[in-house]
Structure formats: structure tokens, C-alpha cells
């Protein structure tokens, strides 16, 4: 966390795009409509969760792997759990920082409304939907070098947002996006967020899709980690 804070652009960048999207698109176009403003805020929260975790874990892990102390740290008898727990705590802190401007803009500049129960539900769902993007970031970080990790994260970033329906209101995306989105991690995640903050129905296919992505990405991340271990210590 201290290392991340020493690079202000990494912290500021994670919060900039979701907040900028709120100010550029949500506030002027749907800010006065309570329903659409609430759904749009949920979409931007999903956007922030995806982008923060893709870059925090994808690029962060890849950069850590090339540091001279990394082989020594990974050989310590404490094992990988303390380091992974620290990385998770750091990642959640950065994710919370990136979400804060979105929530403040929604509160101060739009008509978005949430009951206390819906707010708590949205918080829980936010942590749940972060899991596939954390695993995706780890898979990237343990698979490729830092420069390639930046490229891979950038290549995945916008297509996942667009194809997942994060750029439109519920039901407002082109037909092919509406058909594809529930089966993508972004589309499944945002549908759970919409259900948490509004009257959007809970879709079983989105839940099953999210579980499937967690299993698949978890397997890929574990494989990439073990492959990296084998290369370093075999």
C-alpha cells in the first residue's frame, strides 16, 4: 500500500475514469432521473471495480515479479498467504478510494437514491463482483512481464466494459450486447449491481455466469502462479 501511495498517478488514475464518466455522461444526461441515475451509478461502480482490479493486480503483480527481492520473499517460510492477504487489503483500499468519487458525485450531483438496506446490499455485491476481476488481474500478472501486462489490461478494459453493457442503461444496449452481456464477467456483475440498487430482476444466468468465471479465472490464476513458481525455483 505504501509503495502504491508513492506513485500518485496510480492512485489518482484508478479514480479518474469512473469519476470523469459520471461527470461527462451520467450527471448531464440522466442525473435528474432517480431510477436511471441510480442504475448508471451502479454501472460506474462496476466499471471502477473492473478497472482498479485489472490494473492493481495485473500490472502490480507483474511489476513485483521483476523486483530483485521477489525471489527471496517468496522463499520465506511464512508462505504465500500473508503476502496475498496484504495484497488483497491493499487492493480493497485502492478500490474503495476509486469508488469514493463516484459515490460522492452520485450523492451531490444526481437524483440517485438508495435505502439503507439497498446500500448495504450494494456494498456486499461490490465485494462479490470484485472477485473475478481480482483473479483476472492475478492471471495476467503471473503470466506476462510488466509492459505486456499493461497492454493486456488496456486491451481487455474497454471491450469488457462495452460488451458487458456498462455504457448503457438496463435494456438500452444494442441487441448483440444484450444477448452477450450476461455471459461476460462485466455483464453478469453489473446485473447483480442493478438488482441490488433497484427493481432489476435477479437473473440466474448472470449468477451462474459469474460463478463460472470465478472458477475458470481462479484456475488460470493458480496455473499461472504455479508455472511462475516452477520457473523460478525448479
What are these regions (language model features)?
Residues 80-154, 200-211, 216-219:
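Alpha-helical transmembrane segments and their short interhelical loops
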Residues 3, 76, 80-84, 111-115, ...:
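Juxtamembrane loop-helix boundary motifs flanking transmembrane segments in multi-pass membrane proteins
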Residues 2-67, 95, 115-122, 172, ...:
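Transmembrane helix-boundary elements of multi-pass transport/secretion proteins
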Residues 25-32, 141-183, 187:
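Transmembrane helix segments
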Residues 26-30, 63, 72, 107, ...:
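Transmembrane helix-loop junction
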Residues 1, 8, 65, 69, ...:
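Hydrophobic alpha-helical segments of integral membrane proteins
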Residues 60-92:
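Helix-loop-helix units of permease transmembrane domains in multi-pass membrane transporters
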Residues 24-28, 54, 58, 101, ...:
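Alpha-helical membrane-inserting segments
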Amino acid at each position: 500500500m505504501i509503495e502504491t501511495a508513492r506513485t500518485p498517478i496510480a492512485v489518482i488514475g484508478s479514480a479518474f475514469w469512473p469519476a470523469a464518466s459520471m461527470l461527462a455522461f451520467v450527471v448531464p444526461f440522466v442525473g435528474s432521473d432517480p431510477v436511471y441515475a441510480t442504475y448508471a451509478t451502479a454501472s460506474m461502480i462496476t466499471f471502477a471495480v473492473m478497472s482498479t482490479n485489472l490494473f492493481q493486480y495485473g500490472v502490480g503483480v507483474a511489476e513485483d515479479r521483476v523486483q530483485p527481492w521477489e525471489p527471496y520473499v517468496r522463499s520465506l517460510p511464512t508462505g504465500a498467504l500473508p503476502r496475498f492477504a496484504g495484497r488483497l487489503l491493499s487492493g480493497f483500499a485502492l478500490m474503495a478510494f476509486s469508488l469514493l468519487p463516484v459515490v460522492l458525485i452520485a450523492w451531490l450531483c444526481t437524483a440517485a437514491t438508495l435505502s439503507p438496506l439497498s446500500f448495504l446490499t450494494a456494498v456486499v455485491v461490490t465485494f462479490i463482483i470484485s472477485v473475478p476481476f481480482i483473479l483476472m488481474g492475478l492471471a495476467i500478472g503471473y503470466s506476462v512481464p510488466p509492459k505486456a501486462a499493461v497492454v493486456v489490461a488496456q486491451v481487455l478494459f474497454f471491450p469488457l466494459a462495452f460488451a458487458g453493457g456498462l455504457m448503457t442503461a438496463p435494456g438500452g444496449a444494442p441487441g448483440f450486447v444484450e444477448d452477450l452481456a450476461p455471459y461476460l464477467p462485466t455483464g453478469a456483475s453489473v446485473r447483480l449491481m442493478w438488482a441490488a440498487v433497484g427493481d432489476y430482476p435477479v437473473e440466474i444466468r448472470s449468477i451462474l455466469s459469474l460463478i463460472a468465471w470465478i472458477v475458470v479465472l481462479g484456475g488460470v490464476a493458480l496455473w499461472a502462479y504455479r508455472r511462475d513458481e516452477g520457473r523460478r525455483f525448479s
